[in-house]
């Protein structure tokens, strides 16, 4: 599912529109529910086989994601690269209270589609998909299931996987009800 890099910035205060805010610290980290769940499980040494499935760009953010998967020994054979879009990323502004605001560029995640999930390793038992509303190809309509993501989840259940789903918080997105409910 969703794979991205968060470029996280600590700011002195949230600026008024058109004004400058000082960044006091910056770092990057992985983002996206499926990627972060995989890396957390790997760090916990839970003993489960872990496999990433996603689409990233041919860029430094994509290189960073692959390096993190390698560092924690997560199978990345199903992570594909594309030259048609950059790796998805967010600029995350964190104010002194810890409140975060995300400026997001969907990038390659928009292109991730059903064929990426064909013939997954049968040793895997849990399938986690995220984030709906940021996976444009999987959010497309499907005559039988409503959306392509619903088709994917049904296929995974039919193959014996326990499935889970994560949604992104997008205030006022008119697609929420038809895609999620």
Regions found by a protein language model. Name each.
Residues 56-57, 84-86:
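Short beta->alpha linker loops
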Residues 1-71:
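Glycine-rich phosphate/adenosyl-contacting loop at the front of the ribokinase-like
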